[in-house]
């Protein structure tokens, strides 16, 4: 696709249904693969990251039907210990979730060997945060920089459960340990410094795992999995991804004259930090038609243009909105007062250093802001000017810059706009449709 050129001015109107939740899509594929029987998945995200997970599973003997936007995906499970040693390197593409969850899934496959690799961006991302806790269970994982960087080699072992404190509040780390715990000797207890998204716990229980969650435990949010329970194929309905909905939520609030309804959005409490911040900003947000779909809370969200107040975020809120910080930096530019984001150093080890990239690209559009070691300080009431900017291959940066372009004067050219396809393949088409409505 290359570059996309957007002009400031105009407004957006209509309804939009965002793609399926990326986190839930990955997990539905993985858990279906190690279950017995068939798992059917409605609404699975047909984007690059889940496609990487599906390709890795196929390489290990799992039958996964074609993934596109038109139908239900079927996964024929091979059981808890049925994954085959692959004949080739498992290519995780750009997907950190694929690589980190695969580490947990494969570490306990005794006597089998696996090699995980990815693109240039993924090879730069830290994996020791998963590999080191797995090593406490007896995993043998090697790679560059002492097993911190891909390519990573896994020599499957018989793992032992135990109590593991994770170094960061990360659903990927927690999920990898829970996956490893399914076939370990003895129970595995995972204690986090703060509560991370809980899709794995919800879905593993639905598949039949013996798993207890204690989000308010005295030592910290805790999940305990006991091995031995057979998983059984399920029918999974994937709600819309709130991280993708965030771009439309902010666009509606900052583009004059705009009103949008975002349909079928997952509002799992471990993911709704963005809604808490919008409330802090005084946004006129309506949560409509709340319901429960396959164990996940879902709603429609209606929002319209409105003046906004500055916000401050940090601490335990960050894991609940870590993927939304790039678009929140755009919202901060339009707010009254100075917004402060702290405790978000995790963004420096995403697909890109998102703090540095967003600061660099917004400055190219005339923004004034301070980039700190773990966040940003952004004065509000700023006017942006159209410019040539670059996603730097990051999907969330690409879509955040699109919203910034809508409130800038003049034209903005966004290079490497195709990055949006990692999580939202139809984003540019949807934007054009909402502009025409």
Curated annotation (Swiss-Prot):
Molecular function GO terms recorded: 3-phosphoshikimate 1-carboxyvinyltransferase activity
Q: Does the keyword Cytoplasm apply?
A: yes
- Where does the chain bind 3-phosphoshikimate? 22-23, 27, 170, 172, 323, 350
- The source's domain of life comes to Bacteria
What is the documented function of this protein? Catalyzes the transfer of the enolpyruvyl moiety of phosphoenolpyruvate (PEP) to the 5-hydroxyl of shikimate-3-phosphate (S3P) to produce enolpyruvyl shikimate-3-phosphate and inorganic phosphate.
Which protein are we looking at?
3-phosphoshikimate 1-carboxyvinyltransferase
Q: Which family does it belong to?
A: Belongs to the EPSP synthase family.
Principal localization reads cytoplasm
Q: Which NCBIfam families match?
A: aroA
Catalyses which reaction? 3-phosphoshikimate + phosphoenolpyruvate = 5-O-(1-carboxyvinyl)-3-phosphoshikimate + phosphate
Q: Tell me a GO cellular component.
A: cytoplasm
Q: Is Transferase given among the entry's keywords? A: yes
A single Pfam family it belongs to is EPSP_synthase
Task: Locate the active site.
Answer: 323
Signal peptide stretch: none
Q: In which pathway does it act?
A: Metabolic intermediate biosynthesis; chorismate biosynthesis; chorismate from D-erythrose 4-phosphate and phosphoenolpyruvate: step 6/7
Q: Which gene encodes it?
A: aroA
EC number assigned by the record? 2.5.1.19
Q: Which GO BP terms, alphabetically?
A: amino acid biosynthetic process; aromatic amino acid family biosynthetic process; chorismate biosynthetic process
Oligomeric state and interaction partners are given as: Monomer.
């Amino acid at each position: 696709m290359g570059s996309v050129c957007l002009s400031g001015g105009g407004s957006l109107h209509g309804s939009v249904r965002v793609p399926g939740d990326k986190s839930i899509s990955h997990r539905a594929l993985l858990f279906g693969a190690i279950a017995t029987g068939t798992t059917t998945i409605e609404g699975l995200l047909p984007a690059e990251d889940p496609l990487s997970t599906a390709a890795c599973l196929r390489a290990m003997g799992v039958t996964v039907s074609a993934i596109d936007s038109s139908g239900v995906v079927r996964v024929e499970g091979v059981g808890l210990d049925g994954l085959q040693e692959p004949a080739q390197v498992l290519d995780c593409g750009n997907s950190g979730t694929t690589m980190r969850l695969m580490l947990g899934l494969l570490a306990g496959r005794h006597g089998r060997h696996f090699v995980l690799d990815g693109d240039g961006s993924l090879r730069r991302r830290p994996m020791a945060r998963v590999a080191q806790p797995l090593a406490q269970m007896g995993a043998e994982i090697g790679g560059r920089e002492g097993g911190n960087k891909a390519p990573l080699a896994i020599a499957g072992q018989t793992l032992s459960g135990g109590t593991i404190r994770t170094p960061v509040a990360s659903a990927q780390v927690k999920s990898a340990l829970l996956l490893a715990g399914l076939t370990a000797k003895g129970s595995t207890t995972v204690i986090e410094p703060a509560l991370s998204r809980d899709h794995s716990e919800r879905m593993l229980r639905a598949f039949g795992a013996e798993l207890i969650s204690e989000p308010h435990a005295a030592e910290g949010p805790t999940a305990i999995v006991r091995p031995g329970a057979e998983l059984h194929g399920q029918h999974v309905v994937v709600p819309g991804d709130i991280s993708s909905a965030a771009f439309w939520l902010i666009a509606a609030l900052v583009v004059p004259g705009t009103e949008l309804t975002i349909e079928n959005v997952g509002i799992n409490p471990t993911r709704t930090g963005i809604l808490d911040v919008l409330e802090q900003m005084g946004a006129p947000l309506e949560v409509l038609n709340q319901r429960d779909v396959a164990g996940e809370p879902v709603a429609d969200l209606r929002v319209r243009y409105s003046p906004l107040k500055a916000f401050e975020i940090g601490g335990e809120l960050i894991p609940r909105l870590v993927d939304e910080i790039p678009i929140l930096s755009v919202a901060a530019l339009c707010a009254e007062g100075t917004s402060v984001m702290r405790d978000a150093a995790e963004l420096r080890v995403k697909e890109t250093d998102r703090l540095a990239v967003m600061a660099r690209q917004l400055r190219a559009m005339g923004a004034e802001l301070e980039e700190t070691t773990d966040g940003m300080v952004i004065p509000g009431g700023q006017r942006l000017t159209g410019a040539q900017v670059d996603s730097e291959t990051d999907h969330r940066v690409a879509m955040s810059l699109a919203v910034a372009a809508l409130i800038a004067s003049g034209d903005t050219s966004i290079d490497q706009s195709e990055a949006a396809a990692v999580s939202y393949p139809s984003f540019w088409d949807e934007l054009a449709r909402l502009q025409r409505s």
